C-alpha cells in the first residue's frame, strides 16, 4: 500500500522524532512516498543553511528511489474543484492560506492510491467529502502499526 505523510507529520518528526519508532514498522509493509508540496513547505520553512541541508537529506532518498509525487494539471483542477465545492457548502479549512496546498496533497494521495497520514485530520476530513482520499491521524496510524 502507498503511504504519504503530510507536512505536519514531517514537521513533528523534525521537532520531536515521532517517526523514529514508526519507520521500522512501515518498511516492508508500505511504499512511502514524499509529496513535493510537503517538500516545498519544509524547504520554505527553513531559516538556516543547516536546516536546508537537513531537509535536503530527508528529500534525497525519495528522489533516488523515484518516490516523489508531484501534482499534475489534473491534480490542480481536482484540488481546486474540491475547495470550490467545500466553499459552496459553507465549509472552510482552518488555514485558508494553506488550503490549496492541503488540497494538492490530498489530490496526490488520491492519484497514487495512498493513505494520507496527518496531524490535521479535521481539514483533510473536510476535503475527503469532495476528494476520495483515505486519511488517518498519525496517532491512529501508529497505533495500528503497533497492533499488527
Segments the model singles out, each with a brief description of its role:
Residues 1, 29-32, 65-67, 110-115:
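Short active-site oxyanion
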Residues 1-34, 38, 44-60, 142-147:
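Short, well-structured N-terminal submotif of metal-dependent ribonuclease cores
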Residues 9-10, 38, 75, 105, ...:
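Alpha-helix capping/helix-boundary segments
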Residues 39, 52-55, 76-83, 102:
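A general structural signal for well-ordered alpha-helical segments in protein cores
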Residues 106-148:
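Acidic, PIN/NYN-like endoribonuclease modules and their adjacent C-terminal/linker elements
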Amino acid at each position: 500500500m502507498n503511504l504519504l505523510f503530510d507536512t505536519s507529520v514531517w514537521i513533528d518528526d523534525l521537532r520531536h522524532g515521532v517517526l523514529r519508532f514508526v519507520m521500522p514498522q512501515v518498511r516492508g509493509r508500505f511504499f512511502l512516498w514524499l509529496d513535493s508540496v510537503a517538500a516545498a513547505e519544509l524547504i520554505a520553512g527553513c531559516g538556516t543553511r543547516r536546516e536546508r541541508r537537513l531537509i535536503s537529506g530527508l528529500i534525497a532518498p525519495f528522489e533516488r528511489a523515484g518516490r516523489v509525487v508531484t501534482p499534475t494539471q489534473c491534480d490542480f483542477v481536482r484540488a481546486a474543484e474540491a475547495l470550490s465545492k467545500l466553499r459552496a457548502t459553507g465549509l472552510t479549512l482552518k488555514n485558508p492560506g494553506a488550503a490549496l496546498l492541503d488540497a494538492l496533497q490530498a489530490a496526490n494521495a488520491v492519484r497514487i492510491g495512498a493513505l494520507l497520514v496527518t496531524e490535521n485530520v479535521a481539514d483533510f476530513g473536510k476535503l475527503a467529502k469532495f476528494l476520495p482520499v483515505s486519511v488517518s491521524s498519525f496517532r491512529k496510524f501508529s497505533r495500528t502499526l503497533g497492533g499488527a
